[in-house]
Amino acid sequence: MMNPSHGRGLGSAGGSSSGRNQGGGGETVVEMFPSGLRVLVVDDDPTCLMILERMLRTCLYEVTKCNRAEMALSLLRKNKHGFDIVISDVHMPDMDGFKLLEHVGLEMDLPVIMMSADDSKSVVLKGVTHGAVDYLIKPVRMEALKNIWQHVVRKRRSEWSVPEHSGSIEETGERQQQQHRGGGGGAAVSGGEDAVDDNSSSVNEGNNWRSSSRKRKDEEGEEQGDDKDEDASNLKKPRVVWSVELHQQFVAAVNQLGVEKAVPKKILELMNVPGLTRENVASHLQKYRIYLRRLGGVSQHQGNLNNSFMTGQDASFGPLSTLNGFDLQALAVTGQLPAQSLAQLQAAGLGRPAMVSKSGLPVSSIVDERSIFSFDNTKTRFGEGLGHHGQQPQQQPQMNLLHGVPTGLQQQLPMGNRMSIQQQIAAVRAGNSVQNNGMLMPLAGQQSLPRGPPPMLTSSQSSIRQPMLSNRISERSGFSGRNNIPESSRVLPTSYTNLTTQHSSSSMPYNNFQPELPVNSFPLASAPGISVPVRKATSYQEEVNSSEAGFTTPSYDMFTTRQNDWDLRNIGIAFDSHQDSESAAFSASEAYSSSSMSRHNTTVAATEHGRNHQQPPSGMVQHHQVYADGNGGSVRVKSERVATDTATMAFHEQYSNQEDLMSALLKQEGIAPVDGEFDFDAYSIDNIPV
């Protein structure tokens, strides 16, 4: 089965050529090179194996035949340097040709040519990818076998091009001894032939040595790589999971320091969480600021807009995102305020025109005449830096997000001396069950003020602010509709202002007209009044009682005329007039219309009716306000009823819906005014501020 002449192979032919070249010198090795090429053929088909052997011998190749793949592999292992190239079939019973290809490539590093009758692309591709240098389709042609020597030259040329790294001296000696042993084959050869054999065998052996050393280096590199991976995994810092509690601590620390002033070092000190590093906090802070910037995209452009929040008068507000000390963005982050609501609130605050009145005050600081209830905090609406009228109120800031957002039915009160509804009720209860508030005029039937030249109040001392008057009343009474400061420099008699309380004087701080009179709690309540002529040095007493003894909830419709449900007890005015034939008019209509009962140059005393009638319930408080005409001709008193706990509950039940309340107010504003001598008509359409 083995070819006995395979020992010489390419080495003998090349060696003899080389010897002749050295001796004679004219012939070249190239002419004799393919002769003696050592070929190992492996195929389970004996017919194919015989045909291949004959064709290869025709090409002057030295052929060794094997009909089993395992036998060929054992032969190669015994004599690694005995063959130059291997030709193997693909499909064999004992071992697949691709398996043999792998073993030869790993152990001997010889060029292998695959052959098969299967010419499918997948099989050819598989052979090439496994390391085959060529793929021959059966039946094999002579032209294909003549050129198989190219693969041997190409393989050795690539090996020679790589510089051979010599090992130790002992390894070099062993390789030389192996080269001498593998070159002979038992026959006597010339010195040139031995040199060529040693050269060819040394090439194969050096290649095997390099492949083995490369394997060792790869194994060592893998071990070192595993060690490096383990070291790198040990050097990695533990990952921080930002839970809800940890994020809340972070947000609290940022809010305490301020978003712009917060730095990772200070935040880490405030949080005081073990295992948390500065790098973790810095990374989370950067993401948190990006999140806030994305949420506050609307408010970033706020500084370039000229709106009422950022005018000179309202400069104390600061950015919209932190109204009244509340950080809306922080509320949004902690989940207390949705991101959609935050964007709507920020967008709602933009675009308000900055209107300024003639007196330098912003129009927003004047009480809105469209509604008697404020849907925003007066402190937020008017600002804290406006000290034009009276002293600044010292109150705690209340949370109010934006204009138009109802946070409670809060009454609009003037900026000066205020008296809340609860304080007025407390003052009434402290007065020995007196039904009149501090603004009520006590019974003065048996007493009169001192006569004589009364002291006068200058315009600076009597700067009465009454924002609830309509424009026509303000013009007639000498009050400006914008700043509510008397335009006339005329003085008012002291008798107009010296209104004292008979029972509870300590709870009536309104002598000599305070800088600002408090507005009644519910100005839309019924306003009964009396029209009485005025005469110098005369005392007047007027009392009006209702024709019905029952008490019902007060009507809030300004244009429905009803009788009063309870008495106005002990209404009396005593004053001196500085002019004759001048009258004081007291409005006597629920709709603020004029129903005057005047008598000139006559002493009028309205008799007292129904003293035993039912007294007003404790849940009702009467309010009276005095207005002095700037021309010195008349005095007007507006009497109103105030609902306390019981009536307030009824009011909330009647106007529990905000839309119903607004529609009722707008309906009242759209009715034409009632003509009268002294006009207490409803507010006209042209006076509605925009």
From Swiss-Prot:
Taxonomic source organism: Arabidopsis thaliana
Protein name per the record: Two-component response regulator ARR1
A GO CC term attached to the entry: nucleus
Modification comment: Two-component system major event consists of a His-to-Asp phosphorelay between a sensor histidine kinase (HK) and a response regulator (RR). In plants, the His-to-Asp phosphorelay involves an additional intermediate named Histidine-containing phosphotransfer protein (HPt). This multistep phosphorelay consists of a His-Asp-His-Asp sequential transfer of a phosphate group between first a His and an Asp of the HK protein, followed by the transfer to a conserved His of the HPt protein and finally the transfer to an Asp in the receiver domain of the RR protein.
Induction of synthesis: Down-regulated by gibberellin.
Functional note: Transcriptional activator that binds specifically to the DNA sequence 5'-[AG]GATT-3'. Functions as a response regulator involved in His-to-Asp phosphorelay signal transduction system. Phosphorylation of the Asp residue in the receiver domain activates the ability of the protein to promote the transcription of target genes. Could directly activate some type-A response regulators in response to cytokinins. Regulates SHY2 by binding to its promoter. Involved in the root-meristem size determination through the regulation of cell differentiation.
Residues where 4-aspartylphosphate is found: 89
Cited InterPro entries: ARR-like, CheY-like_superfamily, Homeodomain-like_sf, Myb_dom, Myb_dom_plants, Response_reg_B-typ_pln, SANT/Myb, Sig_transdc_resp-reg_receiver
GO molecular function: DNA-binding transcription factor activity; phosphorelay response regulator activity; transcription cis-regulatory region binding
GO biological process: one example: callus formation
UniProt entry keywords in alphabetical sequence: Activator, Cytokinin signaling pathway, DNA-binding, Nucleus, Phosphoprotein, Transcription, Transcription regulation, Two-component regulatory system
UniProt biased composition (Polar residues): 198-211
All residue ranges annotated as the Response regulatory domain in the record: 38-153
Subunit organization: Binds the target DNA as a monomer. Interacts with histidine-containing phosphotransfer proteins.
Annotated stretches, region: Disordered: 1-27, 160-234
Tissue: Detected in the whole plant. Expressed at the root transition zone.
Subcellular location: Nucleus
Broad class of where this protein is predominantly found: nucleus
DNA-binding region: 239-289
Top-rank taxon, per record: Eukaryota
Originating gene: ARR1
UniProt short sequence motif Nuclear localization signal, positions renumbered to this chain: 236-239
Protein family membership: Belongs to the ARR family. Type-B subfamily.
